[in-house]
């Protein structure tokens, strides 16, 4: 409801190909998603909410989307992802390269080095470092790997730009209204140097990039702007009224911060498979100062008119999921036997154990008496994103004994993600970013009181977890109400719509001194893999 913020219908769609881990190779840090999953999800989710409230559907005035980023895809001249063409239907390199894909690490290092040696460091808005998770590294990696991709790829498009382009019928990659948030945060676009780095920069990197550079959209807008109007075909397919406006796309974590009601002084902790920590500052208070070693610092990336900051962990919930999968290995390999007479019963038992294991681990970990000699972990199972990116780092676990239990190991892993969060917050604060309150959103914040309490204990700060299961979608709602003309600004829409009750986690002061001893060991241990 655009007047109250009340959720009157919702829907969730799980991508089937992604669920089967098709086109992925975790051992190679390769994670791809098929564009058909997105199209199927779009039809399902909007169709389901429209069907749930046929009385409200005729009053829908705007649609906005947020997606993971940088999740780009090579497209042809009609802005069609190459994977939707028959000859590329099963080619992972023709699909969307998911944000956490690290196959472009070598290319990222080349870009970082070229930026450092250039007259202008074009990576300065991403902490003087360009990540393998970002647009140009992925683009270069794909082009270098396939002659036919170099032949057939006309441009590369972010997922958050492609969905609005699909809905509005934009079929020229160079003419779409791209996301300012994605361009500034992931593509080295900055007003200070007139947009993207010059062609000479890309030519020095690899001439294979030049056609892409020339053909991508040079026009981007903040998310309080419209990308266009939905086409008649999509209007009919989704059951929407005519004339629905489609907003410029946004990055999910940034939208989540808006949905959580972010304002200056708030750090929003978006805690899911990874973690993104978002903050705002007025431009004049930063005085042109850039924070080194974070993931993004971009004017108007989160809220128009404010500097948006992004930092985070490349693995958060994925760290816990790794441990769950490790413990479930015997269930999957020994208990489940498809040909056995009781195969269905075995499968049900394995699924029941898998569903319950994290909750039980958290219960037991919460009961542990905190000791200095407990196992200590680092959290870099997918590299370190911030502070000071080091994607080559790996996770560690020390202090194991014959008496070490599974809950103690789970505690160490959760504690490591909390220590990483504290390191980021301390780094932001030391560089002038105001931190007065912490707000938690995302799946982990909703599902794991144990992790949230541990975060409060480690950071020494109260954390409010808002009662909104889909904060990122709520941020898109905020943007949609602005482009529909219901509100004059993002801040005005937030005041009207983002008034959620919250659960508060207060730090337990008696645990803080011992946790800080362990934190110092965590930081020291973090130096070992780098020497």
What are these model-derived regions, one by one?
Residues 1-84, 211, 236, 240-245, ...:
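N-terminal glycine/serine-rich phosphate-binding loop of ATP-dependent small-molecule kinases
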Residues 29, 47, 51-97, 125-133, ...:
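Short beta-strand-loop/turn "lid" adjacent to the catalytic site in phosphate-handling enzymes
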Residues 94-146, 150, 187-200, 298-352, ...:
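Glycine-rich phosphate-binding loop plus the immediately following alpha-helix
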Residues 109, 255-259, 313-317, 321-324, ...:
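Glycine-rich phosphate-binding/hydrolytic loop that grips phosphoryl groups
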Residues 112-250, 334, 378-382, 410, ...:
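Gly/Ser/Thr-rich active-site cleft segment
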Residues 133, 311, 319-321, 326-347, ...:
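Acidic, glycine/GT-rich loop-and beta-edge segments that sit at the periphery of enzyme/chaperone cores
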Residues 134, 188-304, 315, 327, ...:
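ATP-dependent carbohydrate kinase catalytic cores
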Residues 366-465:
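Activation-segment/catalytic-loop signature of the eukaryotic protein kinase fold
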């Amino acid at each position: 409801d655009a007047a109250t913020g009340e959720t009157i219908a919702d829907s969730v769609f799980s991508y089937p190909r992604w669920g089967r881990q098709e086109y992925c190779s975790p051992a190679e840090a390769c994670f791809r998603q098929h564009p058909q999953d997105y199209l199927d999800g779009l039809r399902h989710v909007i169709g389901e909410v429209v069907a749930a409230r046929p009385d409200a559907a005729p009053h829908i005035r705007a649609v906005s989307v947020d997606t993971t980023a940088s999740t780009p895809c090579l497209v042809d001249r009609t802005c069609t992802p190459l994977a939707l063409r028959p000859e590329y239907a099963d080619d992972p390199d023709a699909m969307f390269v998911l944000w956490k894909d690290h196959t472009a690490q070598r290319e990222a290092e080349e870009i970082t080095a070229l930026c450092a040696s250039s007259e202008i460091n074009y990576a300065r808005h991403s902490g003087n470092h360009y990540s393998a998770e970002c647009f140009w590294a992925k683009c270069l990696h794909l082009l270098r790997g396939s002659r036919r991709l170099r032949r057939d790829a006309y441009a590369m498009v972010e997922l958050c730009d492609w969905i609005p382009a699909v809905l509005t019928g934009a079929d020229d990659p160079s003419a779409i209204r791209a996301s300012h948030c994605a361009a500034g945060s992931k593509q080295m676009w900055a007003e200070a140097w007139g947009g993207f780095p010059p062609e000479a920069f890309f030519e020095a990197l690899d001439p294979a990039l030049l056609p892409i550079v020339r053909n991508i959209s040079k026009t981007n807008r903040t998310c309080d702007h419209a990308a266009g109007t939905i086409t008649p075909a999509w209007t009919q397919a989704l059951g929407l009224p005519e004339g629905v406006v489609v907003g410029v796309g946004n990055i999910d974590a940034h939208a989540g911060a808006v949905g959580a009601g972010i304002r200056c002084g708030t750090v929003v902790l978006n805690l899911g498979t990874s973690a993104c920590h978002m903050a705002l500052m007025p431009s004049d208070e930063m005085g042109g100062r850039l924070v080194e070693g974070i993931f993004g610092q971009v004017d108007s990336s989160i809220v128009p008119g404010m500097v948006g900051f992004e930092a985070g962990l490349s693995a958060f919930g994925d760290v816990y999921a790794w441990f769950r999968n490790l413990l479930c290995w015997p269930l999957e390999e020994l208990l489940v036997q498809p040909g056995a007479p009781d195969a269905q019963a075995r499968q049900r038992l394995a699924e029941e154990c898998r569903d319950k294991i994290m909750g039980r681990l958290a219960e037991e970990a919460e009961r542990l008496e905190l000791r200095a000699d407990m196992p200590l972990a680092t959290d870099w199972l997918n590299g370190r994103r911030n502070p000071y990116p080091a994607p080559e780092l790996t996770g560690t676990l020390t202090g194991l004994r014959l008496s070490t239990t599974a809950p103690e190991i789970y505690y160490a892993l959760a504690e490591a993600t909390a220590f990483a969060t504290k390191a980021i917050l301390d780094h932001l604060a030391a560089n002038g970013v105001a931190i007065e309150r912490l707000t938690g959103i995302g799946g982990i914040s909703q599902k794991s009181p144990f992790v949230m309490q541990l975060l409060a204990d480690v950071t020494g700060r109260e954390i409010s977890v808002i009662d909104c299961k889909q904060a990122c979608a709520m941020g898109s709602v905020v943007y949609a109400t602005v482009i529909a003309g219901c509100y004059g600004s993002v801040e005005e829409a937030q005041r009207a719509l983002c008034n959620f009750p919250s659960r508060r986690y207060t730090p337990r002061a008696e645990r803080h001194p011992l946790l800080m001893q362990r934190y110092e060991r965590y930081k020291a241990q973090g130096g070992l893999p780098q020497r």
